[in-house]
Regions:
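Dynamic "connector" segments at or just before major functional cores
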Residues: 1-132
């Protein structure tokens, strides 16, 4: 069983984000697409109502924050800025990272507990794309 390495998965995501074309016009480019993407990814690890407030609070109390320490995000965009930067990005542009992370998890045996009837994978959907 192959051990999943966080840094490998993060580097794959960083490479995909680096290839996303800049969609903004003008000079309003305080945060890069890479910073916004890594910050968005880090939100999955840090459950907090306000990602930015939590990171700033951690920085104030401990002198560092998880976004920088774990994900290499030096300048932390707000939740709204992350959405504004990433909403225009086509999901297919990050497909390589998704499948690479999937492969790491699958090879490491971490997905076995998510098998359903007939050996199929169980997938959680939030329902935002489905209507009755």
């Amino acid at each position: 069983m192959r051990q999943v390495k966080f840094r490998e998965m993060l580097e794959s995501l960083r490479q995909d984000l680096s290839g996303v074309p800049e969609h903004r016009t003008g000079r309003n480019t305080q945060y890069t697409i890479v910073e916004a993407g890594l910050a968005a990814f880090s939100v999955f690890y840090m459950q907090s109502p306000s990602f930015l407030a939590h990171q700033r609070d951690m920085e104030r109390k401990k002198g560092r924050n998880n976004a920088r320490s774990l994900f290499g995000v030096e300048r932390i965009p707000s939740d709204g800025q992350i959405r504004n930067l990433l909403d225009p990005v086509e999901p297919g542009q990050l497909g390589g990272s998704f499948w690479e992370v999937y492969r790491y998890l699958d090879e490491g045996g971490h997905l076995e507990q998510y098998r359903g009837v007939g050996g199929t994978r169980l997938v959680s959907l939030d329902g935002s794309q489905y209507f009755s």
